[in-house]
Amino acid sequence: MLLVIDVGNTNTVVGLYEGQTLAYNWRITTDKGRTGDEYAMLLHELLRLAGVTFDRIEDVIVSSVVPPTLQAIESLCRKYVGRSPYVVGPGIKTGMPILYENPREVGADRIVNAVAAFARWQRSLIVVDFGTATTFDYINAKGQYHGGAIAPGLKISADALFDKASKLPRVEVSRPPTVVAKNTVNSIQAGLFYGYVGLVDGIVERMRKETRDDPLVVATGGLATLIADETQTIHEVESDLTLEGLRILYLRNKG
């Protein structure tokens, strides 16, 4: 079995593949203070619930935007799986030209998503990943990664509002019944939700005009399903895009 791990700033997503099939996947909180042993305890319990033991894991591939957590995961793999993981970063074979001024600056998750999306759809794409930050990445019809945009995530935007406007109550980020709200809670929700929908549509439309292209727009990430249905620009939602990208990169790099 192949263990794939995507370490994000807020959450870490873990997947277990049997061949090409994603058999299990879990989402846990990313904690920079956790040691490799602590992550191993969490993973052991998740595997136990699935009826899987560490000795069934044949290989591991990891993408991470959190260096301390990457070190902990690498320690976990060496100690409990018995091998060092493949790590998405400089030197890994992506099969995708990175047309960025400095390719080393591109987040591992952005490249993984781009690889997975192009492998599946084989056409020009914009990949929108709703995470701690929301990223917009353009891949042309030749499968070349051009770059994109990074915006504050929806939850970061909400937290900033609540932190700076002390009289406003903290509310759940959700789709409100109306844009013209009749109470403070719904007013906040309307501003956050529809404001973010407008941000997504606005950036995608500008990318289309700038590239003079009509790419397929694919959304992924924790909040993709919340936002995508209300936008006018997102065509597909693929919640496991990053995990699938890790599987593809593993196949391109294994000995």
UniProtKB/Swiss-Prot annotation:
**Annotated keywords:** ATP-binding, Coenzyme A biosynthesis, Cytoplasm, Kinase, Metal-binding, Nucleotide-binding, Potassium, Transferase
Q: Which GO terms describe its biological process?
A: coenzyme A biosynthetic process
- What main location does UniProt list? cytoplasm
Q: Which Pfam families match?
A: Pan_kinase
Name the reaction it catalyses. (R)-pantothenate + ATP = (R)-4'-phosphopantothenate + ADP + H(+)
Enzyme Commission code(s) on record: 2.7.1.33
The cofactor remark states: A monovalent cation. Ammonium or potassium.
Q: List the disulfide bonds.
A: none
Active-site residue list? D109 (proton acceptor)
GO CC entries? cytoplasm
SUPFAM superfamilies in UniProt:
Actin-like ATPase domain
InterPro entries (alphabetical): ATPase_NBD (IPR043129), Type_III_PanK (IPR004619)
Residues binding K(+) are D129
UniProt function note: Catalyzes the phosphorylation of pantothenate (Pan), the first step in CoA biosynthesis.
Matches recorded under HAMAP family: Pantothen_kinase_3
Family that this chain belongs to: Belongs to the type III pantothenate kinase family.
Protein name in UniProt = Type III pantothenate kinase
User: Which species is this record about?
Assistant: Syntrophotalea carbinolica (strain DSM 2380 / NBRC 103641 / GraBd1)
